[in-house]
Amino acid sequence: GLQLLQYSQADATFTGIEGQVRQRLTRNLGITLFGDTVRAKLNGGGLLPRIPATRAGVRLDANWQAWEGQVEWVQVARQNRVADFETATPGYGMLNLGVSYNGQFSSGTPWQVYLKANNLTDRLAYAHTSFIKTAAPLMGRNITLGVKVAF
């Protein structure tokens, strides 16, 4: 069976905060702390659906000549402040790595070759904001090799 939903407008209050701070550790090394959280309630009582879970992370980045790299840990909290017809979503942590090399064609056009590895812990994770979260979880361990050319 398909779920049938009917939406109507209602007054609601959203409160939240997001931020990030970056500290340069050396000429070629930096660290970034980031996070966000939001709460939403209907003014007449009740919770709103598909509100994202609280998220926090740390990223270490480095660069040397034309090379760049980063390692990142993102922690997403369990979302159990749910509307009547929703289910809670478990929290998860994700480890991501990336490295890239930047160059330029003789014409001056920039290019980049990159390698990204995401969700290296291969955690089963769900996006609470998705209508199909239980049918389509976030991608498991994955590696991407790509080329970018700006034109």
PLM-predicted stretches and their roles:
Residues 2-82:
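Gram-negative outer-membrane beta-barrel transporters
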Residues 83-89:
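Short, surface-exposed loop/helix-turn segments at secondary-structure junctions
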Residues 27-29, 54-56, 65-67, 93-95, ...:
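Outer-envelope beta-barrel architecture signal
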Residues 81, 101-151:
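C-terminal beta-signal and adjacent terminal beta-strands/loops
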Residues 33, 60, 69-71, 97-99, ...:
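Membrane-embedded beta-strand positions of outer-membrane beta-barrel proteins
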Residues 14-16, 51-57, 92-96, 132, ...:
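Transmembrane beta-barrel architecture of outer membranes
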